[in-house]
Amino acid sequence: MLITFSERFALPVEEVFSYFATPADWVRLYGSVGVRDLGSGWYAVGIKGFPFPLVAKSTLVEPGRLVRWTFRGFWRGEGEIRFTPSPGSVLLEGYERGAVRWLFFLSPIAERLLLESRFRKMWELGWRRLHKRELSRGPETSGDATSENPAA
């Protein structure tokens, strides 16, 4: 299973990056049912609708630029998100590749029929939550002399 994406958000790169820095941060986006620290950077992330947690570890973190991770346990695979800031927004591009361990040649069939749409929906949920965050921020004020100051 391979999921690729390219999404733009009118949010600061630091804010968006904070949702992806470690697997423990993913619960803020994906409606996970909890996260457990397994030590050495590994986390078991419970996912709604899945019988087994996603056991993941960030393998490369460049703050504000890149996050790469790997899976182990029931799932095997990896993923990556690249962050490209521009004035007023950030572009996220990347992929997640995963498979069910122990199904061998049946894994692609099971992934296509049972898992891929669920994983896509999970990513879409995260994107919706970030877009909702954009809307909740509203217009920013700089605090300069043109701003109204009722205390003055």
Regions picked out by a protein language model, each given a short descriptive name:
Residues 24-78, 87, 125-138, 149-150:
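Glycine-rich portal/gate segments that line the openings of hydrophobic small-molecule binding cavities
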Residues 7, 26, 58, 69, ...:
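Polar/charged side chains located within well-ordered beta-strands of beta-rich proteins
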Residues 1-8, 86, 95, 132, ...:
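Hydrophobic-ligand-binding modules of eukaryotic lipid transfer/binding families
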Residues 10-14, 59-64, 82-91:
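A short, structured loop/turn motif at beta-sheet edges
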Residues 17-19, 34-36, 62, 68, ...:
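Intrinsically disordered, low-complexity regions enriched in Ser/Pro/Gly/Gln/His and often acidic
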Residues 1-39, 151-152:
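Hydrophobic ligand-binding cavity/cleft-lining segments
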Residues 71-125, 138-139, 143-144:
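Beta-strand/loop substructures that line and gate deep hydrophobic ligand-binding cavities in soluble
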